[in-house]
Amino acid sequence: MPDTAPTAARARLADARLYLCTDARRSQGDLPEFLDAVLAGGVDIVQLRDKGMEAAEELEHLAVFADACARHGKLLAVNDRADVAHAARADVLHLGQGDLPVPAARAILGDDVLIGRSTHAESEAAAAAAQEGVDYFCTGPCWPTPTKPGRHAPGLDLVRRTAALGTDRPWFAIGGIDLGNLDEVLEAGARRVVVVRAITAAEDPGAAAAEFARRLRQAPAHG
């Protein structure tokens, strides 16, 4: 695990506002430089999400992520696989609705790794807000996104309903969020967001991350 004790990792999660999902930048060939730029810019949590990658290759790339997160004091997340999260000594495991059940993931990882859930309906958000062993959850998609082709986007109404739960558990809005619609997401009640293309495809990813971070930090603290 990048140099964070469990208590420190949970404190960082509580303070987190900007969560980035990115592939391994194989086509660009700039992964170390990209990670340094976005983490310095204000990304709090970074997740490697590169579907179809074999575990051995994923671990190789995660070593680069872990090094960058350790240097910048940020959280490293692994998508879907508890075994890979354990081997990579990640701070965070993120689980979708169809992935390994949380108790099974906890049996593999123990209590030291943070676990997040994806939610796509108010009932799922309410369950994640209350479920033992869950540390945070994501709610959306706010808008249709090519990252999840064919998935219905419940929209900002789900963000409003999630905000109305009044949970103290950290939660992030996700799905098609960019700098052009961020204010709508904030007005709906979110105070944390997951971003993909608005940073990964930006001309200057570090500057894009910094602008997201600035606007999120300036938003009122409720939500």
From Swiss-Prot:
Its cofactor is Mg(2+). Mg(2+) binds at residues 80, 99. Gene3D superfamilies: Aldolase class I. 2-[(2R,5Z)-2-carboxy-4-methylthiazol-5(2H)-ylidene]ethyl phosphate binds at residues 145-147, 176. Keywords: Magnesium, Metal-binding, Thiamine biosynthesis, Transferase. GO terms for molecular function: magnesium ion binding; thiamine-phosphate diphosphorylase activity. HAMAP family: TMP_synthase. Condenses 4-methyl-5-(beta-hydroxyethyl)thiazole monophosphate (THZ-P) and 2-methyl-4-amino-5-hydroxymethyl pyrimidine pyrophosphate (HMP-PP) to form thiamine monophosphate (TMP). This is Thiamine-phosphate synthase. It comes from Streptomyces coelicolor (strain ATCC BAA-471 / A3(2) / M145).
